[in-house]
């Protein structure tokens, strides 16, 4: 079952924000899993999709929000703690929302079109978990600027709830020659905006918005779990 909220993004949105999600066309979404989870993640970023799947299996709550939904690959392959989870999908791209909602139609799914750089149009302190995988490197600005997305995610998580995710970093982590070439190419296309994204800034943003967090890296991907105050 899928329900859809009214859009909160009808006003003008920064063009770079639009560009960062515009590549998620219906045709690209059909090959996204192959391109990302069989392609760039293991071959360019040196981060196996098994790492992300393990994070989802251990962090997902019964009432979950996914921000930047892609195709729903990770949610579709995840083990939820309950048989009938509630899932709220948040994205700026209607194609991604529709594709993922259809893929997860065995669950109770709500879609919300929203900009992660603005406060989320969701109930505060109401959700068990928020996932933000492979999102921030597509959002314009440095980590110091777009780290506000972490604040917005934290605002909707219940006390003691978890915000988790992964993002491709350009410095402070090992970047292979193939990874650097791919990163530069995607930044030139406007698909990525991570040329200023580094590990230390990500750590500082997590520390600013959460009392407790874990941050690690696999290849050039920063991976975090962060908990709100009990």
From Swiss-Prot:
EC nos: 2.1.1.353
Signal peptide (UniProt feature, chain positions): none
Pathway(s): Antibiotic biosynthesis; Polyketide biosynthesis
Short name of one Pfam family: Methyltransf_12
Keywords noted in UniProt: Antibiotic biosynthesis, Methyltransferase, S-adenosyl-L-methionine, Transferase
GO term, biological process aspect, one: antibiotic biosynthetic process
Catalytic function, reaction form: demethylluteothin + S-adenosyl-L-methionine = luteothin + S-adenosyl-L-homocysteine
Keyword Electron transport: no
This protein's record includes keyword Transferase: yes
Catalytic EC class: transferase
A GO MF term: methyltransferase activity
Mutant phenotype after disruption: Inactivation of the gene yields a mutant that can produce nor-deoxyaureothin and its C6-hydroxylated derivative, but not aureothin.
InterPro entries: Methyltransf_12, MeTrfase_VrtF, SAM-dependent_MTases_sf
CDD domains attached to this UniProt entry: AdoMet_MTases
Superkingdom: Bacteria
Function: Methyltransferase involved in the biosynthesis of the antibiotic aureothin, a nitroaryl polyketide metabolite with antifungal, cytotoxic and insecticidal activities. Catalyzes the methylation of demethylluteothin to luteothin (also called deoxyaureothin). Is specific for its gamma-pyrone substrate, and does not act on the alpha-pyrone isomer.
Family: Belongs to the methyltransferase superfamily.
Protein name (record): Demethylluteothin O-methyltransferase
Organism expressing this protein natively: Streptomyces thioluteus
Source organism phylogeny: Bacteria, Bacillati, Actinomycetota, Actinomycetes, Kitasatosporales
């Amino acid at each position: 079952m899928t329900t859809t909220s009214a859009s909160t993004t009808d006003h003008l949105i920064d063009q770079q924000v639009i560009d960062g999600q515009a590549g998620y066309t219906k045709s690209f979404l059909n090959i996204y899993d192959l391109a990302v989870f069989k392609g760039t993640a293991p071959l360019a970023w040196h981060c196996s999709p098994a790492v992300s799947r393990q994070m989802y299996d251990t962090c997902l709550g019964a009432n979950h929000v996914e921000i930047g939904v892609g195709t729903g690959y990770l949610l579709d392959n995840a083990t939820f703690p309950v048989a009938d989870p509630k899932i709220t999908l948040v994205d700026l791209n209607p194609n991604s929302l529709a594709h993922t909602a259809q893929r997860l139609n065995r669950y109770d799914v709500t879609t919300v079109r929203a900009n992660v750089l603005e406060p989320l149009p969701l109930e505060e302190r109401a959700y068990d978990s928020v996932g933000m995988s492979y999102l921030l490197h597509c959002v314009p600005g440095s980590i110091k600027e777009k780290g506000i997305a972490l604040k917005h995610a934290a605002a909707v998580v219940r006390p003691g709830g978890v915000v988790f995710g992964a993002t491709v970093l350009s410095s402070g982590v090992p970047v292979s020659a193939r990874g650097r070439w791919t990163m530069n190419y995607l930044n030139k296309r406007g698909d990525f905006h991570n040329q200023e994204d580094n590990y230390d800034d990500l750590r500082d943003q997590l520390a600013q918005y959460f009392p407790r967090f874990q941050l690690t890296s696999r290849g050039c991907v920063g991976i975090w779990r962060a908990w709100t105050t009990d």
